[in-house]
């Protein structure tokens, strides 16, 4: 064991990759702008500087820890340096904090408060840059950018897209797409991971809050809302509820008090997806055509595939995502309801920014009407709850509305990478006993690895499965599939690392502990669920015998003849 001295305290360390990790291990929250453990070390912000016993100052994020090292994290010299850095950042920053979407969650704002920066000596002489609102998913405001490079590295190193990069030099430097294009003109898939790591309000979610409030205020409108699996373990983050705790019942109570007429669970839509996708998969296995079957639940992945690998479009499942299946069912139910003549508006609460673009795709209209009208991210619904003056933590636990409030544990785990695959396997396995279901857990599809593989016996053959999260990982896997290096029958893809629970619309920050808590929280809900398999959900069976009879393809599948999103 090796030791170093931090602020006169002896601290043991082992395989930490930098001094900053040892400092945080010692319980000192040395905040940074540009450091993320999953990204390459950049060392640009200099907020993590420390001083050694000889008076030398260096960035702790880029320094390898050494046995016997002596450092200090809060000397007068360091305090002066950090305050000066913050002043310079703030001098070139738009300081309209009260109207900023990031107000309260802004790292720059929080650090200024923490370090006592109450006066800026330097004027902001930078010209105002137009805000880019062309994307359906995110908003870019370069006036609030501090050039930390987090979005650049995330887009390149995690997603493999490289949409954003640095341009120009010196005081004119900016982060932008190539040739200063609008985001809507780029190959951006709307995953929102750049927004997750942005420490300021330079990249934010494109809000749909106002039109939803308008719909709720209209007495001639019936507002129906569906809640995605990953939302329930994240929405409590900003209300003092422990991370990863299931807050679904409290959220239902809050939404009722906000005026939503009917509240349902997207897990029910996931149950429908499992029924259709497992059927489609078996048909392809038997025919041997269009394999591997790629999942279609993640709109960011679907758009990525269409743009980079259009030749694989036929391999993507024709099944709509749970959001779109459920939206189509809700609208069809409304069309058949002659008693309620009000206009029906379907709202989705999602962990994902790409879902905002998904609802606008041409194939997601039925009889000329959008299946889902508005998407609110978890972050947006948190803001709406606070606008309504509701304390989520104090809400009673209330149940979903029926009949679409009943769902299986298989639907819940759609919120984690590997969950879709496990849900499909539960549907396919003939033995519905707990022992058989528990065996599925240990096939290799659970866990946080970016690429997971499993071989599952089915009948007289072996089914080869891959589970991948993060588009860069997906790209690498597809290259191996195309080259013949690997071969699979079923491939689950999610654009966001570890799945929807770390989606671009979730409350930030999303560190390793937060991800672990949400991951474990979703599996705890599944463990407590009395219905483990989608085909055991009685409401699903009733729906197939009733509303869906003869309409399965129309409402639950995409029409491949329609033009695809570009």
Sequence positions of predicted segments:
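Iron-sulfur-associated redox domains of electron-transfer enzymes in respiratory
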Residues: 15-68, 74-80, 206-566
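Fe-S ferredoxin-like electron-transfer domains
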Residues: 46-190, 203-217, 222
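A short N-terminal beta-strand-loop micro-motif at the entrance of redox/enzyme domains
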Residues: 9-15
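Charged, low-complexity hinge/linker segments at coiled-coil and domain boundaries
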Residues: 197-203
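Short strand-turn-strand beta-turns centered on an Asx-Gly dipeptide
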Residues: 6-9, 53-54
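Mobile "lid/hinge" segments at catalytic clefts and subdomain interfaces of large enzymes
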Residues: 162, 195, 381-385
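Extreme N-terminal starter segment of soluble prokaryotic enzymes
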Residues: 1-2
């Amino acid at each position: 064991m090796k030791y170093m001295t931090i602020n006169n305290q002896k601290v043991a360390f082992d395989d930490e990759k930098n001094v900053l990790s040892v400092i945080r291990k010692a319980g000192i929250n040395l905040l940074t702008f540009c450091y993320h453990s999953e990204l390459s070390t950049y060392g640009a912000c200099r907020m993590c500087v420390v001083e050694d016993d000889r008076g030398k100052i260096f960035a702790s994020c880029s320094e390898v820890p050494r046995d016997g090292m002596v450092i200090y994290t809060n000397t007068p010299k360091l305090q002066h340096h950090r305050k000066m850095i913050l002043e310079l950042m703030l001098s070139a920053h738009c300081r309209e904090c009260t109207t900023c979407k990031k107000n309260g969650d802004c790292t720059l704002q929080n650090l200024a408060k923490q370090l006592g920066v109450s006066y800026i000596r330097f004027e902001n002489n930078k010209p105002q840059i137009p805000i880019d609102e062309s994307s359906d998913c995110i908003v870019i405001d370069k006036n609030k950018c501090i050039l930390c490079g987090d979005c650049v590295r995330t887009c390149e190193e995690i997603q493999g897209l490289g949409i954003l990069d640095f341009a120009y030099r010196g005081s004119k430097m900016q982060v932008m797409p190539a040739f200063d294009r609008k985001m809507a003109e780029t190959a951006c898939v709307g995953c929102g991971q750049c927004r997750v790591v942005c420490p300021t309000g330079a990249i934010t979610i494109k809000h749909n809050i106002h039109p939803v409030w308008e719909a709720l205020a209209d007495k001639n409108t019936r507002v129906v809302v569906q809640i995605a699996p990953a939302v329930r373990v994240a929405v409590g983050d900003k209300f003092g509820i422990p991370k990863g705790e299931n807050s679904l019942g409290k959220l239902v109570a809050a939404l009722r008090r906000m005026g939503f007429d009917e509240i349902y669970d997207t897990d029910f839509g996931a149950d429908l997806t499992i029924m259709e996708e497992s059927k489609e998969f078996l048909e392809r296995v038997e025919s041997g055509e269009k394999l591997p079957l790629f999942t279609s639940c993640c709109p960011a992945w679907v758009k990525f595939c269409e743009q980079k690998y259009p030749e694989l479009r036929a391999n993507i499942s024709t099944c709509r995502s749970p959001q779109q299946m459920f939206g189509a069912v809700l609208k069809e139910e409304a069309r058949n309801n002659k008693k309620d003549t009000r206009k029906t508006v379907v709202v989705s609460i999602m962990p994902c920014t790409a879902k905002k673009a998904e609802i606008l795709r041409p194939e997601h209209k039925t009889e000329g009407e959008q299946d889902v009208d508005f998407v609110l991210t978890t972050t947006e619904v948190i803001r709406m709850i606070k606008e309504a003056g509701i304390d989520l933590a104090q809400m009673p636990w209330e149940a979903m509305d029926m009949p679409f409030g009943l769902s299986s544990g298989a639907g819940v785990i759609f919120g984690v990478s590997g969950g879709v695959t496990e849900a499909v396997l539960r549907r396919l396995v003939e033995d519905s006993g707990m022992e058989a279901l528990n065996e599925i857990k240990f096939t290799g599809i659970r866990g946080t690895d970016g690429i997971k593989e499993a071989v599952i016996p089915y009948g007289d053959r072996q089914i080869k499965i891959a589970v991948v999260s993060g588009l860069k990982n997906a790209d690498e896997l597809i290259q191996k599939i195309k080259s013949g290096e690997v071969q699979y029958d079923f491939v689950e893809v999610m654009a966001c690392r570890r799945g929807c629970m770390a989606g671009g619309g979730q409350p930030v920050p999303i560190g390793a502990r937060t991800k672990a808590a949400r991951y474990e929280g979703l599996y705890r809900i599944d463990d407590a669920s009395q219905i483990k398999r989608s085909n055991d959900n009685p409401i699903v069976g009733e729906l197939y015998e009733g509303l869906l009879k003869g309409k399965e393809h129309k409402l639950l599948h995409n029409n491949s003849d329609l033009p695809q999103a570009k």
